[in-house]
Amino acid sequence: MGCSLYPQGYPAIVNQLRDFKGTNLLADIGNGTMNILYINNKKAQESRCWTEKLGVNQCMIAAKNAVLDKFGVKIEESTVEQILRFGTADISAPYLDCISSIARQYVAELFSTLRKYEYNPDLMRLYVVGGGGCLIRNFGTYDKSRVTIIDDICATAKGYESLAYM
């Protein structure tokens, strides 16, 4: 019996590899970290794989602190989560604007970090898995034809299943 090891996020896209051409970048944006992996001609480049402490929780903390600093009140984490996941919540506009501004800054930081690792949307496609995809979709400025957000929460499990039968 053998054991296979795969870079973080890779199983989530394994069923889509047939569509990959040229250079692609995978960003797995989870709660605590963003894992970055280059995939060239359908092959993971393990030597071009990095982890940044830039997970969704950093955005959550920043949003809650911004509301506390600006309005002097604590906001429920579930309310902030609603905004981050769906882009809105049933709260007054000043609070929504405050949190949305933080989310836009966070997404800008995500893209800045990707550029640090030579991400160029003109030269490659970006695939995003994990909870951070919601933030990019709701608060990011990007070319939708060059960025694929995989929001299937079962994508990783499906990928591992496929890998088990390869």
List PLM regions with ranges.
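Gly/Thr-rich phosphate-binding beta-strand-loop-beta motif of the actin/hexokinase/Hsp70
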Residues: 17-45, 63
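Conserved ATP-utilizing enzyme core subdomain
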Residues: 54-76
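Short hydrophobic alpha-helical module
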Residues: 12, 39-42, 66-73, 113
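Nucleotide/phosphate-binding catalytic cleft detector across ATP-hydrolyzing
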Residues: 1-24, 45-58, 78-166
